[in-house]
UniProtKB/Swiss-Prot annotation:
Family as reported in the entry's similarity comment: Belongs to the pyrroline-5-carboxylate reductase family.
Reaction catalysis annotation: L-proline + NADP(+) = (S)-1-pyrroline-5-carboxylate + NADPH + 2 H(+); L-proline + NAD(+) = (S)-1-pyrroline-5-carboxylate + NADH + 2 H(+)
Pfam families: F420_oxidored, P5CR_dimer
Null allele phenotype: The proG proH proI triple mutant is auxotrophic for proline.
HAMAP family hit by this protein: P5C_reductase (MF_01925)
Signal peptide: none
UniProt protein name: Pyrroline-5-carboxylate reductase 1
Keywords, in A-Z order: Amino-acid biosynthesis, Cytoplasm, NADP, Oxidoreductase, Proline biosynthesis
Classification via PANTHER family: PYRROLINE-5-CARBOXYLATE REDUCTASE (PTHR11645), PYRROLINE-5-CARBOXYLATE REDUCTASE 1 (PTHR11645:SF49)
EC annotation from Swiss-Prot or TrEMBL: 1.5.1.2
Gene Ontology molecular functions: pyrroline-5-carboxylate reductase activity
Chief location: cytoplasm
Length: 297
């Protein structure tokens, strides 16, 4: 299920809501950038914290106009939404230190790869509403494909809050938690596949005499146009492909070469291998954390 696009205005659902990012790495920054760009939440209501890197917090403050604070300076209890964005290996200690400060009404959004809602629920022990989130790096410009999986204590109102907040970064899809690995293979890692494709488009154009930047711009606009055709027409990609493929024409020649080189199968294998690796990472975390706290899968 995908959320509807929203206009750039302050939304009533965010009235007086305060959001804190626990962790200040690249994933947190991408989400902060998307949310700030959307201009739906007052910047002063967005906070970010990390263990001790004040230089990084100052950098984010200056870049995005939000508040940065060390854990002992941030009033966790006053927040409405807590976004867990630390490294997964640090989750055990972070949850342990936050446990006594988190309030039952607070919505927890977790972008911790491989860590389930059940694990977080059991770690906090007070029927905490938890939503597992998988954005991609396009969140930085408000164009992410973001998946959410709901924990068992998430109410309909909190689901709407999560969708509205994450909708600031792009499109939001509600999936089952056991579908997170394949979503990661398609959308989490997906931007890299297209960047890889663009490398070859740019290089080939340049070798044929095009300016490097021009070749890049042409390729990027072509990818953007194809994506918009899929989204706006609702047509099956095969139909759109057939519509521009004349017998013995240029597109047919290009597609034949692509198929001969294993293009379609390569794409399929890339997604499958990324999904497999996502599952392996989850299992590695399980081996480490399960004896301590419970359920990760």
């Amino acid at each position: 299920m995908r959320t509807k696009k929203r206009t750039k205005e302050m939304l009533p659902i965010f009235d007086q809501k305060k959001v804190a990012f626990i962790g200040a790495g690249s994933m947190a920054e991408g989400m902060i950038s998307g949310i700030v760009r959307a201009n739906k939440i007052p910047k002063q209501n967005i906070c970010v914290t990390n263990r001790s890197n004040t230089e990084r917090l100052t950098e984010l403050e200056l870049q995005y106009g939000i508040k940065g604070a060390l854990p002992n300076q941030l009033c966790i209890e006053d927040m409405d939404v807590l976004i867990l964005a630390m490294k997964p290996k640090d989750a055990e200690n972070a949850l342990s230190s936050l446990k006594s400060r988190i309030q039952p009404h607070q919505l927890i959004l977790s972008v911790l790869a491989g860590i389930t809602t059940s694990f977080i629920e059991q770690s906090l022990l007070n029927e905490q509403p938890v939503v597992r989130v998988m954005p991609n790096t396009s969140s930085m410009i408000g164009a992410s494909a973001t998946a959410i999986a709901l924990g068992k204590y998430v109410s309909e109102d909190l689901k709407k809050l999560a969708e509205a907040l994450l909708g600031c970064m792009g499109e939001v899809y509600t999936i089952q938690e056991n579908q997170m690995d394949i979503f990661t293979g398609i959308a989490g890692s997906g931007p890299a596949y297209f960047y890889y494709l663009m490398e070859f488009i740019e290089k080939t154009g340049e070798e044929a005499g095009l300016d490097k930047q021009l070749s890049r711009s042409i390729g990027a606009q072509t990818l953007l146009g194809a994506a918009k055709m899929l989204m706006e027409t609702g047509e099956h990609p095969e139909i759109l492909r057939d519509n521009i493929t004349s017998p013995n024409g240029t597109t047919a020649a290009g597609l034949q070469a692509l198929k001969k080189s294993g293009g379609g199968e390569a794409i399929s294998q890339a997604i499958k291998h990324a999904a497999k690796r996502s599952k392996e990472i989850s299992e590695d975390i399980e081996k480490t954390a399960a004896p301590l706290s419970g359920v990760i899968k």
